[in-house]
From Swiss-Prot:
The lineage of its organism: Bacteria, Pseudomonadati, Pseudomonadota, Gammaproteobacteria, Pseudomonadales. It comes from Marinobacter nauticus (strain ATCC 700491 / DSM 11845 / VT8) (Marinobacter aquaeolei). Its EC number is 2.4.2.9. Disulfide bonds: none annotated. This is Uracil phosphoribosyltransferase. It is an enzyme of class 2 (transferase).
């Protein structure tokens, strides 16, 4: 199933806190990291394990370790940085690629202004992270870049998604799996998610939030 709406009680509770209009930058930032980590847990539960014998405190012991999986985390700037530490807390050896996307507020189309990708993308699973999947433009553009650079296995972690954006992404890239805390109701006329979280980038970085 390409869309996974993760309804774990901890995720639902934390997402509810994030929806508050009066939430502080500190609390929003911390919750974005926490929910990002919980989504990572769900998105990686099919990783293969291999048994290995190590030296334990009382002698040799058989353990299981993740085998054969290289990962690159791909935050979409700038808001995706707000989830990065949470994902890295669970996959600390992952390489980080960076894609900068900005939305043209007149056309609602995504424009790429930065692309810094790690090597060997054909040998890595790419985890795209972005708090909001709204119109889908930034996500589609980022997936296009990754595939052009050699990526063959791509998953996306988003805190909140709009059904319109999900539909567009999966129409263009049906092989990409999306993990989200919530598929919300719809987009408003300005392309923002309702009920959504407001402008996640502004809330993470403490900048002035636009009228959404």
């Amino acid at each position: 199933m390409p869309i996974h709406e993760v309804k774990h009680p901890l995720i639902r509770h934390k997402l509810g806190l994030m929806r508050r209009a009066d939430i502080s930058t500190k609390n929003f930032r911390e919750l974005a990291q926490e929910v990002g980590a919980l989504l990572t847990y769900e998105a990686t539960k099919d990783f293969n394990l291999q048994e290995k014998t190590i030296e334990g405190w009382a002698g040799p012991v058989s353990v299981e370790q993740i085998h054969g999986k290289k990962v690159t985390i791909v935050p979409i700037l700038r808001a995706g940085l707000g989830m990065l530490d949470g994902v890295l807390s669970l996959i600390p050896v992952a390489r980080v690629s960076v894609v900068g996307q900005i939305r043209n507020e007149d056309t609602l189309e995504a424009e790429t202004y930065l692309e810094k990708l790690v090597g060997e993308l054909d040998q890595r699973m790419a985890l795209i992270i972005d708090p909001m999947l709204a119109t889908g433009g930034s996500m589609i553009s980022t997936i296009d870049l990754l595939k052009k650079a050699g990526s063959t296995e791509i998953r996306a972690l988003v805190l909140v998604a709009a059904p319109e954006g999900v539909e567009k992404v999966l129409e263009k890239h049906p092989d990409v799996s999306i993990y989200t805390a919530s598929v919300d109701e719809r987009l408003n006329e300005k392309g923002y998610i309702l009920p959504g979280l407001g402008d996640a980038g502004d809330k993470i970085f403490g900048t002035k939030q636009k009228d959404v």
